[in-house]
Amino acid sequence: INTPNINRLAENGLRFNRFYNASRSCPSRASLLTGLYQHQAGIGRMTFDEELPGYRGTISRDAVTIPEVLKNAGYRTSMIGKWHVAETPLREDQRDWLNHQVQHETFTDLSNYPVNRGFDTHYGTIYGVVNYYDPFSLVEGEVPIESVPEGYYITDALSDRAAEEILQSDDTPFFMYLSYTAPHWPLHALPEEIEKHK
């Protein structure tokens, strides 16, 4: 597999040799967004409320997020991509719930959406596991996006939106958190990318 950017990072990048990651996925994301140990942030495991302190499945109201601090300091803040640090309600029929074609007014409590945790704007998904061609829980701010255009591919859509946000920058200090779904399963790749590796 041709990986020029990863190769360049390996050759010229900084190596952290006294660094560890205490957990995977959602807990690490919560730590990154708050600067706290994942249990202090409220996500000790994943985004299910286990009704135990440190395992509430969403970033705690006591945990201040980086964009909340930066917004108070005069920054414009933007989040593009996968949020996946808010409680994921369980449904009896998970397949029905995860079907993008079934519309929902909200995907978690609105107070836990990125635009209510310090980000001025958010384009992306609330949940973590999505179809790359027709993503479930795709929102603009608090509003669900009911359909995507033909040929939609979430990795490209997130990159394009991030570039648009950067181009809109003025003299206001700007912070963007870009969180791709890739390389999370279901690992959907564009046909032309797959063809390169046959």
Which positions does each model-derived feature cover?
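Formylglycine-dependent sulfatase
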Residues: 1-198
